[in-house]
């Protein structure tokens, strides 16, 4: 299994950023929450993930939210070690991203060691993203549509802003520093069995996308939210060319 592809798919479904004119804590979309997930393959845990929605920040006359994702390896020993972190800072009103920070730290017995920090700065006024990797002199400029999301701000928009009960398709342009994707998430209401809640009514968002690591073969991303007004993201499934993996919700904590 290619862990890198699993990680890319996870951050598609789903470090503080400093502002030069100062910042302060402001009210976010309710108390901050941390969602903890486990991904298993053949019943064995392979990845642990935590997804945290932070209360907003305020600076330069605007309010912002932050979403943080941490993904680590589970019980893989010397075969593979991962401790990757991702942070998205976005405008509170629209969830349009301001910055997306990737901190990659992983290595394995048969994998190349990767340790780098990359910052994506979104500039919707000029329809571009500036990509800067720590230690590199060059700053890449990538042209994107005005309303382009990173993977975490996409997740936040679905969680905080979208009316999933309308069952309308959600169309988004997403850029993660690797490639620009046009994705359509199709909602569907259904009952599912969950680890911590039992059987619940849920809304499933489903989108098809291609994966460069599999010769651009298509895979499917599914996210289930509880259909109870809270929209708790209880399950994420990756249907990849190499098979399916599920990230199930284990626990929710207040931050």
Indicate where each model-derived feature is located.
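Sec-dependent N-terminal signal peptides
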Residues: 5-13
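C-terminal segment of classical bacterial N-terminal signal peptides
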Residues: 14-19
């Amino acid at each position: 299994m290619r862990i890198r592809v699993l990680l890319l798919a996870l951050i598609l479904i789903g470090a503080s950023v400093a502002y030069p004119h100062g910042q302060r804590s402001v009210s976010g979309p309710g108390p901050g929450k941390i969602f903890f997930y486990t991904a298993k393959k053949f019943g064995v845990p392979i990845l642990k993930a935590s997804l945290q929605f932070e209360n907003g920040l305020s600076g330069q006359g605007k309010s912002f939210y932050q979403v943080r994702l941490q993904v680590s390896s589970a019980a893989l020993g010397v075969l593979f070690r991962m401790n990757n972190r991702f942070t998205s800072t976005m405008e509170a009103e629209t969830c349009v991203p301001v910055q997306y920070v990737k901190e990659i730290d992983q290595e394995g017995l048969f994998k190349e060691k990767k340790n780098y920090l990359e910052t994506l700065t979104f500039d919707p006024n000029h329809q571009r993203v500036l990509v800067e990797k720590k230690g590199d002199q060059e700053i890449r400029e990538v042209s994107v549509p005005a309303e382009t999301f990173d993977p975490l701000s996409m997740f936040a928009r679905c969680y905080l802003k979208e009316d999933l009960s309308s069952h309308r398709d959600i169309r988004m342009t997403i850029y993660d520093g690797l490639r620009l994707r046009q994705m359509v998430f199709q909602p569907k209401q259904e009952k599912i069995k969950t680890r911590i809640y039992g059987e619940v009514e849920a809304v499933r968002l489903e989108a098809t996308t291609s994966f460069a690591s599999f010769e651009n073969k298509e895979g499917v991303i599914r996210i289930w939210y509880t259909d109870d007004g809270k929209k708790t993201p209880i399950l994420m499934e990756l249907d990849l060319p190499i098979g399916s993996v599920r990230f199930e919700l284990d626990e929710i904590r207040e931050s």
